[in-house]
Regions:
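Amphipathic alpha-helical polymerization modules
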Residues: 1-237
């Protein structure tokens, strides 16, 4: 009877892990159209005692680059993240470069987080360009001299796959990811472009089907255990 109870406990544990993994698959599919979204994968680790632990890892593979007509759209071509700051001073990191000019004139994310330390676009800006090294250049009229008004920073991490999902397609640091370091490069940023999600629909659906089969097997095992319990109770009576 003790062995049967242990089997049931392990099966419940394993089923819980399967449901958690299914939740991450659903989130990945939901964000298929989200700019620069990075899928999360739930890695199952079988312990010596037969129980399953789970670890969350971020798939940092770069998504395809899509050309845009919006000068505020910026893509990272390579590794790295944009540091962005909330109104409360919280810092998170994103690859989603679908920026805008905020009501205060600063370069902002679509949900009003400030990019970097703050890059204010002049009210009389005729046009601006964002160079591959992140420098933001403003022109106040046609034929005028360029004026550098700031630089969009890029940072990197020792273990970016250990970053955790934060607020609205942003990432937060963890002990495993390490602290951010400024990337010093003349390349890496592309204006008039956005990165698409790296979600692979076929892989996610394949994982979902395997999870479904695994959960069906777990439920069948629970039914077998329940039948055995019922028979043992009847024999005792």
């Amino acid at each position: 009877m003790y062995n049967m109870q242990a089997i049931v406990r392990k099966n419940i544990n394993n089923t819980t892990m399967q449901f958690e993994k299914l939740g991450y698959i659903a989130t990945n599919l939901t964000n298929y159209s989200t700019s620069a979204y990075k899928t999360s994968r739930f890695e199952q680790i079988l312990r010596e005692d037969g129980y399953i632990d789970g670890a969350i890892r971020t798939n940092v593979r770069q998504g395809d680059i899509r050309i845009s007509r919006d000068p505020y759209d910026v893509a990272i071509d390579g590794h790295g993240y944009f540091p962005v700051v909330s109104a409360d001073g919280e810092v998170q990191y994103t690859r989603d470069g679908a920026f805008k000019r905020g009501s205060n004139g600063y370069l902002m994310t679509s949900d009003d987080w400030m990019v970097g330390d703050g890059i204010k676009i002049p009210a009389n800006c005729y046009k601006f360009e964002i160079r591959p090294n992140g420098d933001v250049i403003s022109y106040d009229k046609a034929g005028s001299l360029p004026e550098k008004i700031g630089t969009i920073p890029l940072v990197e991490f020792d273990s970016p796959e250990s970053l955790e999902q934060g607020h609205n397609n942003k990432m937060v640091i963890t002990e495993e990811s390490g602290m951010p370091r400024i990337i010093k490069s003349d390349q890496g940023i592309r204006q008039y472009a956005t990165e698409v999600s790296n979600t692979n629909i076929y892989d996610e659906i394949n994982d979902m089907m395997r999870m479904n089969s695994s959960m069906i097997a777990s439920m069948q095992l629970m039914k077998v255990a329940n039948d055995m319990y019922s028979k043992s109770i009847n024999i005792t009576e």
